[in-house]
């Protein structure tokens, strides 16, 4: 059976050196923030010190990490809710903090689906240690809560060594 090419955002696999990928840190999410899906790349909002989804393909600001999930007090029920998705503004009781959990280890390694394929082994090997843009980073599946971010393989280049493909 062939592998399905499903978009799933960035999934942590391990850190450099093979250590456990399970560590996250807590950051606040602004109550008016857009939806953030599990596996979405996030960055620090410049004005409020909260996290937000990485806003656009090709955004040159440094990523903070990858969104793992959140907790907030539901605006309708008043109950604490744990979710792999921040559904967006209007969802939380603004009297309480909205907490987002982010895989933010700079040595973290991820697996991500690509929007295309390399035609042969030599082409794939040539892309190792290059960088590429992430597309669809702001969208996700509202049923599963999983990001639809994927690697734009056509943008692979070796001018920025900060996030190499391995």
Predicted regions, residues:
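Surface-exposed, low-hydrophobicity beta-strand/loop segments enriched in small/polar/acidic residues
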Residues: 1-166
């Amino acid at each position: 059976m062939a592998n399905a090419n499903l978009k799933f955002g960035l999934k942590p696999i391990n850190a450099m050196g093979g250590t456990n990928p399970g560590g996250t840190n807590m950051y606040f999410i602004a109550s008016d923030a857009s939806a953030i899906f599990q596996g979405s790349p996030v960055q620090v909002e410049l004005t409020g010190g909260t996290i937000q989804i990485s806003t656009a393909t090709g955004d040159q600001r440094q990523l903070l990490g990858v969104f793992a999930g959140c907790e907030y007090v539901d605006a309708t029920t008043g109950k604490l809710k744990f979710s792999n998705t921040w559904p967006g503004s209007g969802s939380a009781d603004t009297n309480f903090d909205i907490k987002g959990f982010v895989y933010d280890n700079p040595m973290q390694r991820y697996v991500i689906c690509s929007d295309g394929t390399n035609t042969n082994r030599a082409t794939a090997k040539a892309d190792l240690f290059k960088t590429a843009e992430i597309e669809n980073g702001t969208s996700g599946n509202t049923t599963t809560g999983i990001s639809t971010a994927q690697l734009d393989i056509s943008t692979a280049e070796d001018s920025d060594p900060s996030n190499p493909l391995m």
